[in-house]
Amino acid sequence: EHPSKGEIVIAGKHIEKLNEKQLVTFRRERVGFIFQSYNLIATMDAVENVALPLSFRGMGKARRAKRAKEYLKLVGLERFMTHMPNQMSGGQQQRVGIARALVVNPQIIFADEPTGNLDSKTTMEVLRLMQKIVREQNQTLVMVTHDNNLASYADRRIRIMDGRIVGIETGGREALYEGNAEKKECNENESK
């Protein structure tokens, strides 16, 4: 979907100017997605679920499996590689989803309420894992959440109300606790 106004620039590309085929290619090559409901394929084990996006890139089966196993190890699931989604807990399924998003080495990861279906302990484990990995791999994570505690871990927070940007805050959790966070309230004219 194209924006009604303004522009979207990711990695120097004006996304709003791309046609449908170019958008598909851009998403496949540069974007990873983490979903609230995991979106794992029930008939595939963890390795197959993680390897799936690599098949769309034309990567051979053995190479896909090897890479998928590397990312499952990265998220701490080396013992669950042959497990089907219904044999894993919610936290384990979400880690498979994270591995699937990361396996394509995206520049940007979009996470839609990635911990919405998890208990508080697993939420913190998953959040720390995502934060660690994206920092180590120099990736951008864009996370949608209604949980202010989760949002406080972000380096930059954009508050949206009724489809308009109403505030922008910078500084991660450490800056918030130390009182060094920068806050900007947006008025009607700035948010257009």
Task: Identify the function of each model-found stretch.
Residues 164-192:
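Conserved beta-strand-loop-alpha-helix hinge in the C-terminal portion
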